[in-house]
Every structure is written in structure tokens, then in C-alpha cells.
Amino acid sequence: MGVLKLQTRTVLLLASMALALLLALAFLLASGTAAYAGSTSVFSVKCTSTHQLADDPIVNPGVPGAAHLHEFIGNPTTDANSTFLSMTAAKGSVGCDTQSDTGGYWVPALYKQDGTRVPVLHSFFYYRGPAGVKQIPPDLKMVAGGDTLNPPLPTEHAGSLSWSCVDSGPFFAQPPDCTSIGKPIKAHIQFPNCWDGVNLDSPDHRSHMAYWTSAKTCPASHPVRIPRIRFNVAFNIKNGKGTYLSSDHGVPGGTSLHADFWNTWDQAVLQQAVTKCINGNKDCTRLKDNDPRLQ
């Protein structure tokens, strides 16, 4: 009987340890920031929202007020009349951890049911491998999301669009209620990472780019593999139920989630980050100015 009890206790202990391990792994996969912590072939930048405008220099260039309201993140000069040169000239005044990231990042504004705008809490922009990617071409423009109003069940690694609680899962097609865990809500937008090798933009701002296949290869039509860019944008609200985006016209709240990216970085530093971090298989999360990991 003593041996049987000992065996039973051992089995229960092992089962408990296995369950704890599975829960820990599930949490790490579900966490926007934690999922990337300790990974290699990645660099990231943390930025703050700098201003809001009904402008879109990719979709409506040169036409102020022609778009829905956007949260412009990082570069404080971004507007309808922005150019590559005006964006790069903002170095020294951007709201990012590294002043070399003068890139263009923007997402639709989020509103409460009463019409009050929800501020952006913080944003992380991840650039991931695997190793062997090409440099993101200067002046590349692209839009991700917005055209997929009924996405499949989003996950951390599949599906270009999702909502979650900060540092927690699961992932949803609409903003969730995170009050039970005391966390704000977060939007995730995954950009395509295969370029056609020719066009820096296209009429729909999407066709010159494609997502890689399930085999992690680029289609023949878009053979140039560049870093996978992911926006993780946290909003300062815990209960996202009933919130809606400025782009949600006649669709359920949050399902028009999309984002715009414009490569107006300091190109020399961006090249260093791609070479040293992604292609060098290093973890360069939270890049700073004069970051030793780029040396």
C-alpha cells in the first residue's frame, strides 16, 4: 500500500508540473510582449502616440482631412503633406526609444460608446525574422488589415488582425473586456513580409505585398522576403466591449482594424538592425539610441 501511495503521489506531482508548464507556455504564447521576450532574430521599438489627425499620407496624400481620425505614433510631423524628407527630418523629436526610428506608424482612433476618444497607452513595433531577410526598401508604404472584416479566429502567429488584453490571451476579433485581470486592451496588426521587388506602393496599398505561405516561403509573385512587422498598440481602457474604431462604418466594433506603415527610418540604422539583430540571430527588443547590440 505504501508503494502504491508513493506512486500515486508521484503521478499527481508530475501531472501538476506538466499542467503548470502548459499554462506557462500558453501564457507566453498569448502575451504580446512576452511572446517575443528572449526570442532571437528580432528587434523592436517602443513609441508613444504624438497626435491625431483625419489625414492619411498613404491613402490620401496631399489632402488634409480626407480620412477618418488616425492615431499617429512616433513621428510628430506625420500628416497628409508629409514626404520622405520631411519625415526623416524629424530625427531628434520623435516619440520613440530611438530617435533613428522616424518611420510612419498610424492606426484608426478608438472611441467609447459615448463618443469619447480612448488614448493610446503605448505601442511596440516588432521586426522579426527568420534570418536571411532583405532590407526593407526605403520609402516603402503598405497597409495591413481593414479589408478582412470577418477574419478567422486570430492567434498570436496566424491571422493578421486580433485584439487581446495586454500580456494575456486569448485573442479576439473585437476588443475584449479585460477588467477581470486589470489589464488594458491591445490591438495586434501583422504586416505582410513578401515584397514584389519593384513597387514601393500600389493603388490599393496592398497588392505589392503578400504574406508568406504556411511553409514560410514567399510566393513567386512576391519573392523578396523582408522583416515581419507587427504593431502591438495598447489603448488606455480595460473594458473594450462597445468600443469602436473611427473606421468602423457599418461593421461590428473593432473589426475594421488596420494600420499603415511607411519606411522613413534612418536607413543606415535600420540596415544595422536588420543585419545585426535579425540576420545575426540576436534579441534586440526595445532598441535605444546608440544601442550596443547594433555594434
Regions found by a protein language model. Name each.
Residues 24-42:
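C-terminal region of N-terminal signal peptides and the immediate post-cleavage residues
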Residues 36-67, 71-189, 196-295:
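Primary mode marks residue(s) on the alpha4-beta5-alpha5 output face of response regulator receiver
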